[in-house]
């Protein structure tokens, strides 16, 4: 018999910024690194013989919670990846709801009929993932292993291992970031002992789900900001000059704020010239989503850092909370490259 801990990756950019990231190689967030520390404590007294993960940054980084303290190598396998979301990749969930609501509902509730151009079906995910998991189990007979993967893929796999048909997978729960499930494999196949346990996050007040509402909705739909190129009139309303590019932050057709991007200011650095929400939209836990637009924009251009000036201590505290650090010049800097973070 093989015991397998299935672990979802820590909070990553797609989770924080509410962007569809399947095969997109997003980074771990500041809260995500705290979740990894809590996960390491959770596994401190659990014997593990081998550690596996998908080959994406967010799972490999999360797996450090187990393989580094235990002195084990990390085995990566692309068959453990998240579902490929095709043309959805890189779009916010709110944008997808506005443009493709029926398929969003299918993704959340009717996985047997969900498919988007260029993406995988749920069955295709199962056809690569379960054989890979079976191979891991067979190679580690009599041992205990940890396997790090992704939310949607694990939801599909765990539901299937519980004996549910494809048509019922949409009624199964989502697991929080770093949620742990335990399965056993023997001659009769897989048995799910428990799934989606996140008590190490609840105890530390680090749950991503506790700060989000979408999963509480019956159809699991977003009601959030969306983003469009900013018009000259909107620039004027926000007091943003003509330099660079600007993204309007909107909600229900109403201007809520914006982001000004200055890609020509410094080579290799993505500068933000203006970032904010209008007063009526502040204090509603809406302020961080627009940063995801800047991160994706600048990463595509090859930048490894995002920088901005903060005018007051409150704003500086906000950006520190989300991983920015102060430079010797007094600017706030966020690293968006793929080097390992200590």
Where are these regions (language model features)?
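Active-site-adjacent alpha-helix immediately C-terminal to a catalytic or transition-state-stabilizing loop
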Residues: 60, 130-189
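Conserved GNAT acetyl-CoA-binding A-motif
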Residues: 298-311
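Phosphate-handling substructures
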Residues: 70-127, 194-196, 206
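Conserved catalytic-core motifs of GNAT/GCN5-like acyltransferases
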Residues: 307-309, 320, 325-338
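Conserved acetyl-CoA-binding loop-helix of GNAT-fold acetyltransferases
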Residues: 34, 277, 283-296, 321
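Acidic, low-complexity terminal tails and accessory targeting/binding regions
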Residues: 87-94, 160-233, 328-330, 337-342
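Conserved beta-strand in the GNAT
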Residues: 248-263, 269-276
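Active-site-proximal alpha-helix that buttresses catalytic centers in soluble enzyme cores
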Residues: 7-72, 76
